[in-house]
Amino acid sequence: MAQLYFRYGTMNSGKSIEILKVAYNYEEQGKPVVLLTSRLDDRDEVGYISSRIGMRRKAYPIGNDTDIFDYIDDISPRPYCVLIDEAQFLTRANVYDLARIVDELDIPVMAFGLKNDFQNNLFEGSKYLLLLSDKIEEIKTICHYCSRKATMVLRMEDGEPVYEGVQVQIGGHESYISVCRKHWFNPPRERIVPLK
C-alpha cells in the first residue's frame, strides 16, 4: 500500500542528496521513478535537483498551476515512486494532487523540503504535507553556532540576521544558515560573518 512521505530538514541538512540517493536505489533495481522540483528554485538551473556535493539530476519543474496528478497519471509505464524536491514551495492543490497519486494510483510519493521559513512560519506546501502525510521524518543537521540540533533557518544579509521580508527569496549558504532555537532568537554577534 502506497504512502505519502514528508521528509523535512533545515538548509544544508542533506535533503537533495537524500532524494538523489532514493532515486538511485530504485533505479538500480530497474524500478523507474519520477523526479519533480519547484520551478521557483533557480539556484543551479530550473528543472534540476542539485546537492552541495556536486550531484545533480534532471527533474520535471512544477509550479502553482501544475496538475501533478494528471502529469503522473499520463506516464506509462507507471513509476514505482514519485520524488519531489523543494516541496515547501508546493501549493495546497499540489499537495492534494500528491495525496490523490498515493490513494488513487497506489504510487508512493516522497516529498523533501523545508518545514519553516526564516521568520519561523510554515511554508504552504509544508503545512499541507504535515496535515496529509502518512509518514513524517526529520532530516537532522547541527546548528551553525553550536552542537545542538538545527531546527530553524536564519536569513543573513551582509553578516546581519534578518527577521522581516518576503517569505521566498531563493538563496543558498550565502543567504541562509541553519540554527537551533536559542541561536535563532539570539545569534552570537561576534561569530556572525558573511558566508561565502
UniProtKB/Swiss-Prot annotation:
Keyword terms, alphabetized: ATP-binding, Cytoplasm, DNA synthesis, Kinase, Metal-binding, Nucleotide-binding, Transferase, Zinc
Listed Pfam families: TK (PF00265)
Active site, renumbered: 86
Enzymatic reactions: thymidine + ATP = dTMP + ADP + H(+)
CC terms in the record's Gene Ontology section: cytosol
EC numbers on record: 2.7.1.21
Annotated Zn(2+) binding sites: 143, 146, 180, 183
A single GO BP: thymidine metabolic process
UniProt subcellular location: Cytoplasm
Binding site for ATP: 9-16, 85-88
GO MF entry, a single one: ATP binding
Family: Belongs to the thymidine kinase family.
Subunit and partners: Homotetramer.
NCBIfam families named in the record: PRK04296.1-4, PRK04296.1-5
Xref: PANTHER family: THYMIDINE KINASE, THYMIDINE KINASE, CYTOSOLIC
Full protein name: Thymidine kinase
Name of the coding gene: tdk
